[in-house]
């Protein structure tokens, strides 16, 4: 059955006009989710089916889809819905996803942003990028193959990146005659594996056929034994609470906004908490306090702002604030740290080894860090830990970092913005890894260690003539 995009027109009619429709859209909740799993599990086809069955495809897209489906012949006489998502020529030729593709759609209940991520192991870094902003992950399992290594890998990465809602979709049920026993077996297999994952996960299971649309947006008549919700019903009903509103205030300064001599504000996106006019705030790491005089936006001043809003704060005092500083509530007693344990997803061909130094970007702040040691690498298939000397491409491990300056940090599980970082190669300026702060450590350089004059002179010479070694000032400077 071919559907054309009359969904928006119908919603406008139901709402009573364009203005009422736009107002309703602004107040809909947003769900960001990704599809992941092993190669050829049907991730792109599933997204294409969701777009098709929710009437998000225009007539010209359908015409092109018919033409491309016949030309490629990948699904016989049926539409190859994966072509709606696989945009790269290499993806279409190989029938796989390489890049992370984003798609947007909405229903009467909710707005959605989908990230279609690659299944191949060599593109795990792309999958991690897609998962970093999502609230829910759909893990596809091929009904002919079951739980595979890449399924376990993606489950681990998704939970590592803070995703707590998982939907395990057993796809291609049409190829196993819609047998309930197959679905139940894979459900038990995944639950056995999930015992090694965090205990606070919300896991749901849906049997479906993305190619034919069974249990995607409408119930399947061929699987009467399944009485649960369809995939779309799960996506519309999952409770994604914006916990960042209840968290302490975090406002990373992105730049100083000074268009003229009469205005000075500090621009950025509010990461967590609520900021209000008249609220006393503290600037970190300096510790200077002031009061919020105005909250400026493009559409005018606000009396308060919440997480995700791009704002400019004007303070009552002339305070020395620069890019990378963090504004928090004045009652906060945060301590800066110079060492931290960081979960790392490595994304470069050249492995990560102890002793190397990298540029680090975290919440608008750019600094430098040295890899003190690699505590272990996670074996994804078994989720066991093993001691290694280096972390290879797509490797995930726990690393101790020593920063060149004290930083105010949160754990990633508490705040993705102030607890997440990227590693940048200092020579090529290429992003080579992603880091998730697990906890801060008391720096060994904060101890009252006494050094001899020779040690201090040698340290100064090394830092002056061999800066690429990443040696740190023994007196605690940069």
UniProtKB/Swiss-Prot annotation:
InterPro entries: CysN_GTP-bd (IPR041757), CysN_II (IPR044138), CysN_NoDQ_III (IPR044139), G_TR_CS (IPR031157), GTP-eEF1A_C (IPR054696), P-loop_NTPase (IPR027417), Small_GTP-bd (IPR005225), SO4_adenylTrfase_lsu (IPR011779). The keyword Transferase applies. Residues 209-211 are annotated as: G5. It comes from Yersinia enterocolitica serotype O:8 / biotype 1B (strain NCTC 13174 / 8081). PROSITE patterns: G_TR_1 (PS00301), G_TR_2 (PS51722). It is an enzyme of class 2 (transferase). Residues 116-119 are annotated as: G3. GO terms for biological process: hydrogen sulfide biosynthetic process; sulfate assimilation. Belongs to the TRAFAC class translation factor GTPase superfamily. Classic translation factor GTPase family. CysN/NodQ subfamily. Residues 171-174 are annotated as: G4. Transmembrane segments: none annotated. Pathway: Sulfur metabolism; hydrogen sulfide biosynthesis; sulfite from sulfate: step 1/3. It catalyses: sulfate + ATP + H(+) = adenosine 5'-phosphosulfate + diphosphate. Its EC number is 2.7.7.4. Keywords: ATP-binding, GTP-binding, Nucleotide-binding, Nucleotidyltransferase, Transferase. Residues 95-99 are annotated as: G2. It comes from the Bacteria. This is Sulfate adenylyltransferase subunit 1. GTP binds at residues 37-44, 116-120, 171-174. Residues 37-44 are annotated as: G1. Heterodimer composed of CysD, the smaller subunit, and CysN. Residues 28-244 form the tr-type G domain. With CysD forms the ATP sulfurylase (ATPS) that catalyzes the adenylation of sulfate producing adenosine 5'-phosphosulfate (APS) and diphosphate, the first enzymatic step in sulfur assimilation pathway. APS synthesis involves the formation of a high-energy phosphoric-sulfuric acid anhydride bond driven by GTP hydrolysis by CysN coupled to ATP hydrolysis by CysD. One of its GO terms (molecular function) is ATP binding. Pfam families: GTP-eEF1A_C (PF22594), GTP_EFTU (PF00009).
């Amino acid at each position: 059955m071919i559907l054309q995009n009359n969904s928006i027109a119908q919603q406008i009619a139901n709402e009573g006009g364009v203005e009422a429709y736009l107002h309703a859209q602004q107040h809909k909740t947003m769900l960001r989710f990704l599809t992941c799993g092993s190669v050829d599990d049907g991730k792109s086809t599933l997204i294409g089916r969701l777009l098709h069955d929710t009437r998000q495809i225009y007539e010209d897209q359908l015409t092109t889809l018919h033409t491309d489906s016949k030309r490629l012949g990948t699904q016989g006489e049926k539409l190859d819905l994966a072509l709606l998502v696989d945009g790269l020529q290499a993806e279409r030729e190989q029938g796989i996803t390489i890049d992370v593709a984003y798609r947007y759609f909405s229903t009467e209940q909710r707005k959605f942003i989908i990230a279609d991520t690659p299944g191949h192991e060599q593109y795990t870094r792309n999958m991690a990028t897609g998962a970093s902003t999502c609230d829910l992950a759909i893990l596809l399992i091929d009904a002919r193959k079951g739980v595979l290594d890449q399924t376990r890998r993606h489950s681990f990465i998704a939970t590592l990146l803070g995703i707590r809602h998982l939907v395990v979709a057993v796809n291609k049920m049409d190829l196993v005659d819609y047998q309930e026993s197959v679905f139940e077996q894979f459900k038990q297999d995944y639950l056995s594996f999930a015992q090694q994952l965090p205990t606070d996960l919300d896991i749901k299971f849906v049997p479906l056929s993305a190619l034919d649309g069974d249990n995607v947006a409408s119930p399947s008549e061929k699987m009467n034994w399944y009485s649960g919700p369809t995939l779309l019903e799960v996506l519309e009903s999952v409770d994604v609470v914006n916990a960042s509103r209840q968290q302490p205030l975090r406002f990373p300064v992105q730049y100083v906004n000074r268009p003229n001599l009469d205005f000075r504000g500090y621009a950025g996106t509010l990461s967590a908490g609520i900021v209000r006019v008249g609220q006393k705030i503290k600037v970190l790491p300096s510790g200077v306090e002031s009061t919020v005089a105005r909250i400026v936006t493009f559409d005018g001043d606000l009396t308060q702002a919440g997480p995700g809003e791009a704002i400019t704060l004007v303070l009552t005092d002339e305070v020395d604030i620069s890019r990378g500083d963090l504004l928090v509530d004045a009652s906060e007693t945060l301590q800066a740290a110079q060492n931290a344990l960081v979960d790392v997803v490595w994304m470069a061909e050249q492995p990560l080894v102890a002793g190397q130094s990298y540029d680090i970007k975290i919440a608008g702040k750019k600094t430098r860090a040295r890899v003190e040691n690699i505590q272990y690498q996670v074996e994804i298939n078994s989720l066991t830990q093993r001691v290694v000397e280096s972390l290879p491409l797509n490797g995930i491990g726990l690393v101790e970092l020593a920063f060149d300056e004290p930083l105010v940090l949160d754990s990633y599980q508490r705040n993705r913005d102030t607890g997440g970082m990227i590693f940048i190669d200092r020579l090529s300026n290429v992003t080579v890894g992603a880091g998730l702060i697990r906890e801060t450590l008391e720096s060994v350089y904060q101890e009252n260690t006494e050094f001899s004059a020779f040690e201090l002179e040698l340290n100064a010479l090394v830092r002056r003539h061999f800066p690429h070694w990443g040696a740190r000032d023994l007196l605690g400077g940069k």
